[in-house]
Design a protein with these regions (language model features):
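General secondary-structure propensity
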Residues: 78, 123-127, 232-243
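Acidic/polar, glycine-enriched structural segments that form the non-catalytic walls/loops
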Residues: 1-126, 159, 166-167
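Catalytic cores of carbohydrate-active enzymes
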Residues: 227, 239-255
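Aromatic-rich carbohydrate-recognition surfaces in CAZymes
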Residues: 127-236, 249
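Alpha-helical scaffold segments in carbohydrate-active enzymes
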Residues: 91, 95-98, 186, 251-255
Length: 255
């Protein structure tokens, strides 16, 4: 992280896991802190802050954020006389759109789930995953609400496989993330919609391993395993691999 402050008298206490900031204020005094973040280094965090908002006031940043959210959420118009229902809908849409989010620095650098530093040459890199169960409705919703960004999300998800994607968060995660089961189904859905144009040649073997790793020792896991096997079958068919398609189509019914 990197912090710009409006007064030099604020002295933070920093250790490996937390930042403690103590300060004295007069009545009605405002404190302005600008914080830049990076998954790579403090130097990258400083560059991000200076590039994005160093010359903007708090009010400018808040106004720009409000406009950006209104433009995104306003794509869906709700017709109802019940204002509570309308508020409920837009609140949930707002929550759904908060993740995943871009984590690459302005230089293109980002840290992967394996702890290594990568460089995104063209596309923004997304992180902050929670796919288990939300793959059913949230991600199809994002494909409608923000299709351009969604393509980048799916490309980032494909890159996650190349970093050795586990089902749960690793100790080296660059930002908050949780479960990523059923990424197979998420990528298949994007492919069916023409929203993923990456190569499956490298991905499919990694997906096979992930699907095989789901145990078959309870009814719910058997169903989840079967769904991923069906996804593998469909992806194999897209690649023209008829034998693999047939094999995993049969295995998808093991439940």
């Amino acid at each position: 992280y990197y912090i710009e402050k409006d007064k030099s008298t604020y002295k933070p206490e920093d250790n490996d896991s937390e930042l403690l900031w103590k300060f004295q204020t007069e009545p009605n005094e405002q404190i302005i802190l600008k914080i830049g973040l990076s998954s790579v280094s403090a130097e990258e965090a400083e560059a991000n802050l200076k590039k994005e908002c160093s010359n903007q006031s708090f009010e400018q940043i808040r106004t720009n954020a409000r406009i950006a959210w209104e433009n995104l959420l306003g794509q869906i118009q709700v017709e109802t006389s019940d204002e509570d229902l309308k508020t409920s809908f837009y609140t949930r849409l707002y929550h759904a759109c908060q993740t995943p989010f871009t984590i690459n620095d302005y230089s293109g650098s980002y840290k992967g789930s394996d702890g290594k530093v990568y460089k995104s040459q063209q596309l923004p890199y997304y992180h902050g995953w929670s796919i288990w169960d939300t793959y059913r409705t949230k991600y199809p919703l994002l494909s409608i609400v923000c299709p351009t960004e969604y393509k980048h999300m799916i490309s980032s998800l494909a890159e996650l496989y190349k970093q050795g994607k586990p089902r749960s968060a690793t100790k080296a995660e660059p930002f908050l993330t949780t479960r990523t089961e059923h990424s197979i189904i998420t990528i298949l859905d994007a492919l069916q919609k023409g929203m993923f144009d990456g190569s499956l040649d490298e991905l499919l073997p990694l997906m096979l391993k992930e699907a095989e790793d789901i145990s078959n020792d309870s009814p719910d896991k058997a169903l989840e395993r079967g769904y991923d096997f069906w996804g593998v079958s469909e992806l194999a068919g897209k690649m023209g691999n008829k034998e693999l398609k047939k094999e995993f189509s049969l295995r998808s019914k093991e439940y």
